[in-house]
């Protein structure tokens, strides 16, 4: 059974995540004090029910040691996972402006901007421990719920899930990435007028990139690097490894390379997901 701990900055989507987890069959509790986590897990253990609990700045323990101690007290039948949701500063400010809600730290006579920054510092111990970090800046409510369903229901228990995602540097680097590889030096299909409207999923673009030795060398060396360190990552008690591949616009080269890497590791029995940020925005 899973004990999913959901945390993140206010306005990043924790309530949406809890609702999505509840739809997936999790027993959900909002803002449960950390010291009560073992008691909740023990209560649910006999019922064979996975649980999801949100922790935010209002019920953060005074020290990281309190959280670590609570994790050691969980029943053996529960596997804890920490999901951390985040969004960029401007997005959080806009969301608060749209909803006109008060930030939890506004009671300390802080401005909204200062409250967001202080909250980030207070939550850093949880963020650094997270199994999965999701940047919701560009996501709708439905997209976040769908991503959680895909990543959680598509994951085999106790196995590292490799996530290969393409992106465009002009849109910013994904904050949930564990590794970032820059492929802007590879031959660019954008300069071929026939290929420009296509993507790295289309056969003509694939054929174009397949013709270049440097493309194959990059893919070979990148997968060799990942294969070298994958055994250590798998034994490091992590649930996800997110590898981000970036080109200028996130449409051609990064998409192709991400798919090639995903196919390679999938063929070797790894649990793999692929995602293309720029292409998803165009839908």
UniProtKB/Swiss-Prot annotation:
Keyword field contains ATP-binding: yes
A GO term for molecular function: GTP binding
Keyword terms, alphabetized: ATP-binding, GTP-binding, Nucleotide-binding, RNA-binding
Pfam families cross-referenced by the UniProt entry: PapZ_C, RapZ-like_N
Chain intervals for the UniProt region annotation (RNA-binding): 266-283
Residues bound to ATP: 8-15
Positions bound to GTP: 56-59
InterPro entries in the record: P-loop_NTPase, RapZ-like, RapZ-like_N, RapZ_C
Biological function: Modulates the synthesis of GlmS, by affecting the processing and stability of the regulatory small RNA GlmZ. When glucosamine-6-phosphate (GlcN6P) concentrations are high in the cell, RapZ binds GlmZ and targets it to cleavage by RNase E. Consequently, GlmZ is inactivated and unable to activate GlmS synthesis. Under low GlcN6P concentrations, RapZ is sequestered and inactivated by an other regulatory small RNA, GlmY, preventing GlmZ degradation and leading to synthesis of GlmS.
Quaternary structure note: Homotrimer.
Similarity section: Belongs to the RapZ-like family. RapZ subfamily.
Name of the protein described by the UniProt record: RNase adapter protein RapZ
Gene: rapZ
């Amino acid at each position: 059974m899973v004990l999913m701990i959901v945390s993140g900055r206010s306005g990043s989507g924790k309530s949406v995540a809890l609702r999505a987890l509840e739809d997936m069959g999790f027993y959900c509790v909002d803002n449960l004090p950390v010291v009560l986590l073992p008691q909740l897990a023990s209560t649910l253990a006999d019922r064979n029910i996975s649980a999801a609990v949100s922790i935010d700045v209002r019920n953060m323990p005074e020290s990281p040691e309190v959280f670590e101690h609570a994790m050691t007290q969980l029943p053996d039948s529960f596997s804890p996972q920490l999901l951390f949701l985040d969004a960029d500063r401007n997005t959080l400010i806009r969301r608060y402006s749209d909803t006109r809600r008060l930030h939890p730290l506004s009671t300390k006579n802080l401005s909204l901007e200062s409250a967001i920054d202080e909250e980030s510092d207070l939550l850093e111990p949880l963020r650094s421990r997270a199994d999965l970090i999701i940047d919701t800046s560009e996501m709708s409510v439905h997209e976040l719920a769908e991503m959680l369903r895909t990543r959680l229901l598509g994951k085999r228990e106790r196995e590292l899930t490799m996530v290969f995602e393409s992106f465009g540097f002009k849109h910013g680097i994904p904050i949930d990435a564990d590794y970032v590889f820059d492929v802007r030096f590879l031959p660019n299909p954008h300069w071929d007028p026939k290929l420009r409207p296509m993507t790295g999923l289309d056969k003509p673009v694939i054929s174009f990139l397949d013709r270049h030795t440097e493309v194959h060398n990059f893919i070979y060396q990148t997968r060799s690097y990942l294969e070298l360190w994958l055994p250590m990552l798998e034994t490091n008690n992590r649930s996800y490894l997110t590898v981000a591949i970036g080109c200028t616009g996130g449409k051609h080269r990064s998409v192709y390379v991400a798919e090639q890497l995903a196919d390679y590791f999938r063929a070797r029995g790894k649990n793999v997901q692929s995602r293309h940020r720029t292409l998803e925005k165009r839908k």
